[in-house]
Amino acid sequence: MKTLLLLIPLVLTACGTLTGIPAHGGGKRFAVEQELVAASSRAAVKEMDLSALKGRKAALYVSVMGDQGSGNISGGRYSIDALIRGGYHNNPESATQYSYPAYDTTATTKADALSSVTTSTSLLNAPAAALTRNSGRKGERSAGLSVNGTGDYRNETLLANPRDVSFLTNLIQTVFYLRGIEVVPPEYADTDVFVTVDVFGTVRSRTELHLYNAETLKAQTKLEYFAVDRDSRKLLIAPETAAYESQYQEQYALWMGPYSVGKTVKASDRLMVDFSDITPYGDTTAQNRPDFKQNNGKKPDVGNEVIRRRKGG
């Protein structure tokens, strides 16, 4: 019974379902990747606080970080690979008998009263027949076990999907409309809204702990936005960040499964560097100097460097 329980995991190792979850931009998207990219971008756009723009006509400017590149992910999943060879090899004795044809030659010589007869026997140099006999037993025994993964995974990432920017821009416009904010051409706007999308892509990872294995695909959307009154140059919305990530994960045991499939959407880490602590220089004479007396009551935090300069340190 113990032997049977040990053999079952070895036989079933690497038996499972392979789901296509490539890197961002690798040809036609799988449904899983589409779902994750859409979920993270929708969540990030939905988090945008646009209350300060109520009743305004906004011109929208969206800038997205480029994601063109090329890469290659190759190599199958890790799995046990064992081989047992053995053990017994025997060749029987072999004997071959050849049969060569023979022929007789007789020569008679006469000279007057003398005569002689010569008789000789000759063999051909090629056998007319051959007979081989084997004696004894011949046997060969071997045993082998080889367990491989579910296959080689290869992904090509070359070109970005040109529709991504259009999709994200349409999502932002949809949220503006649902919030009651009118998006108009720049010549009819009283407010300029700038949205910078720093992160908009996917990250694929694989966890291999021999007994526990996992395939994970994450989609992240991180953006920063601010709004300016076109006439007064007041900063209606200080630079704010919205960041979300969605995740799809398959969990395996000895690459059997997946026994668990999960999807999550959550807030992710903010931008490593944002512009929320930037304020105008005190001696600026620019006509379009932004006014940080904001209508939404959200005054940006002043950085340590700015405080040091104000104190003359």
Swiss-Prot record:
Ribonucleoprotein recorded as keyword: no
Keyword Membrane annotated: yes
Membrane topology, from the record: Lipid-anchor
Swiss-Prot/TrEMBL GO biological process terms: cell adhesion
Lineage of source species: Bacteria, Pseudomonadati, Pseudomonadota, Betaproteobacteria, Neisseriales
Polar residues bias: start-end ranges: 282-297
GO CC term (a single one): cell outer membrane
Protein name (database record): Adhesin MafA 2
Family in the record: Belongs to the MafA family.
Key words, A-Z: Cell adhesion, Cell outer membrane, Lipoprotein, Membrane, Palmitate, Signal, Virulence
Lipidation (N-palmitoyl cysteine): C15
Lipid-carrying residues in chain (S-diacylglycerol cysteine): C15
Signal peptide residue numbers: 1-14
